[in-house]
């Protein structure tokens, strides 16, 4: 499903203003850092907990708007901190995600989670399900503005922290990591939804992944990169994805 933006000047100006507002709100949550509490309120028994993975140069604080919305809807939520500003290897972060889920399974006594991977956090989660068998503990995976074709915006990171950060090299479109990630197959039975902002300058619109239904689970809405976690229409797509009954699952044809 793709929703194109209106071409009128007034509509375009409104989109720009909302995107700037979302960026400012995102920055306020960024400075909250990683010392934030997960919400263990669980008023909808039987629903999987939601695990949120932040993006490059992000913190757990950036996931708090989504965490609050899920908590308000009765879901137990956990924000996942994968390294200082996500500078290290994405493969190492994916391994840590698997270990984090294992610990939560033992602590909470639950078998499966719904996972939201924002931006680079989506690449981490996708690698975990494709190569580290994380799908055994993940019921559904939402990739929120994840650059699954890579992004040349990573060159900014290469120029600034490239000497100490493997991850900025791995997110480039020409990287072996991106090539392997696209070539790997999604595990059978795992439903994945890709959600993108039409005006996202950091993550240009990628191709649908093989195994993702391009009509049902490839969603494009007006907004920029920060809008993905700040704007309610994007949250509605996450909620509908996680709330859909399991018997709605259907075989998906290859998208590539």
Please annotate each region the language model reported.
Residues 1-52, 57-59, 63-73, 78-80, ...:
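Flexible, membrane-associating and regulatory peripheral segments of lipid-active enzymes
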Residues 47-48, 186-192, 213-216:
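Short, proline-enriched alpha-helix->beta-strand connector loops that line the catalytic pocket
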Residues 50-56, 61, 73-186, 206:
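Serine-dependent carboxylesterase/thioesterase catalytic core
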Residues 80-83, 218-224, 230:
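Short glycine-rich catalytic loops that host catalytic nucleophiles or stabilize transition states
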Residues 193-200, 222-223:
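Conserved strand-to-loop "acid loop" that flanks and positions the catalytic carboxylate
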Residues 201-207:
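Conserved alpha/beta-hydrolase "acid-adjacent" motif
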Residues 207-213:
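Short loop/helix-cap segments at secondary-structure boundaries that form the rim of catalytic
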Residues 229-242:
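Post-His helix in hydrolase/transferase enzymes
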